[in-house]
Amino acid sequence: MNPDVEVKTYRMFVDASNIRGLIREYDFIIDGTDNFPAKFLINDACVLEKKPFSHAGIIRFKGQLMTYVPGQGPCYRCVFKNPPPKDAVPTCKQAGVIGAMGGVIGSLQAMEAIKYLIGVGDLLTGYLLTYDALTMEFHKIKLPKDTHKCPVCGDNPTILEPIDYEQEICEETAGRFATRDEQ
């Protein structure tokens, strides 16, 4: 263990009123949340505070991640625009999450943070990395950045503060997953 690393825990709900203050003191943010509203909240706060971060998402046997560095590629909102409408995407409770997927994708996020912090290697800035555990295939997809239209990192931003969206959080779903018939 690195003796210079300090770990802080926060027993609080993170929302638009407190997220900017929470992330301000950190050098790199890792998004390990389980819902779209939280992902947009983290993205918007990181962009507004000029903080680099790694986004990740998992469901069933699939995962994805991307890294945002201010001024060096698209943010999460550039790629995904807005949270999907309620019921448009299955929740973790409906679809299930394989615990090992969190380990695989979380380890990749940790590597992104380490590379950024020590200044080595190529980050996933401008790319979306997807992983399918059923086929054991990774795909690195180049992402275009449309700075003219993004409402948070674009040339004329309209989102000037983080937004709280209605959210449904995964409840007690670790290890549950849909059967092959439901996929």
Where are the language model's segments positioned?
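Adenine nucleotide-associated cytosolic modules
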Residues: 1-183
